[in-house]
């Protein structure tokens, strides 16, 4: 029973950290990365469709993305979707593919993005702590129902705290890495 609570907490904490990393990958740094365009939806035959289902996106070099669209008639729609996104990108078409040059980030924009990244990391820390709180509440319920002893409860809470500390450390490492990426020119 205690192991189920610990495993559940561990799985949920891992999902929180994974979610943070996914969110951070969508925040633009100075480098071109195909995942930058993952959030873009294109109007395709009346339905909003993710860009990655309509095209192949690759990093041509450190500052340029190349988009090979499977259906050539969709080039204008994809171009419009990128232009209207909040990424501030300006694609150019050569009839076959779209090239998306990434403008260098200004110092002010870097600071803004750093604030956003820190807020995301804090949200992940809060989520991890909430999971710890839920696990400890489950343990208290077991203790109250006399299904576990006080020693087992204390030991399990210490293990959950160690889990929490390790996942918060992962969040801090992800934050430090992203801040370093953002501050590189």
Swiss-Prot record:
One of its GO terms (cellular component) is cytosol. SUPFAM superfamilies: Ribosome recycling factor, RRF (SSF55194). Keywords: Cytoplasm, Protein biosynthesis. InterPro entries: Ribosome_recyc_fac (IPR002661), Ribosome_recyc_fac_dom (IPR023584), RRF_sf (IPR036191). Signal peptide: none annotated. It holds the Pfam family RRF. It is found in: Cytoplasm. One of its GO terms (biological process) is cytoplasmic translational termination. The keyword Protein biosynthesis applies. GO terms for molecular function: ribosomal large subunit binding. PANTHER family: MITOCHONDRIAL RIBOSOME RECYCLING FACTOR PSEUDO 1 (PTHR20982:SF3), RIBOSOME RECYCLING FACTOR (PTHR20982). Belongs to the RRF family. Responsible for the release of ribosomes from messenger RNA at the termination of protein biosynthesis. May increase the efficiency of translation by recycling ribosomes from one round of translation to another. HAMAP family: RRF. This is Ribosome-recycling factor. It comes from Aeromonas hydrophila subsp. hydrophila (strain ATCC 7966 / DSM 30187 / BCRC 13018 / CCUG 14551 / JCM 1027 / KCTC 2358 / NCIMB 9240 / NCTC 8049). The gene is frr.
